[in-house]
Amino acid sequence: MNDSAKTATIYHNPRCSTSRNTLKLIEDAGIEPTVVKYLETPPSHDGLRKLLDDAGLRPSEAIRKKEALFKELGLATASEDELLDAMVANPILIERPIVVTDRGTVLARPYEKVREIL
């Protein structure tokens, strides 16, 4: 029996090479994913919390610490809840891509990590 993923959703930033490479791997696996351009349609607070929980990640593990806004907002000493709030308010801070399939959820960094759930 084939236990490969049948469906996929990618939280995608087309300007990010890692996100583009991840999308290509999904498509090369024969899956036509749902593409969520999260900068245009960001997840809700509860939606982002669920994505991170499903991936086994804390907000501090899924926030873009090198993004200028991270420093501008003084987030280095923020709590996990404060980081999540900042990510919802400023989706550019969300590390990408996050991929959800019927086999699990991963932050696909490096992009090959998506193979774990395909």
Question: Which residue ranges define each predicted feature?
Answer:
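Thiol/selenol-based redox catalytic cores and closely related redox-interacting motifs
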Residues: 38-118
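Local sequence-structure signature of Cys/Sec-based thiol-disulfide redox active-site neighborhoods
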Residues: 2-29, 33-38
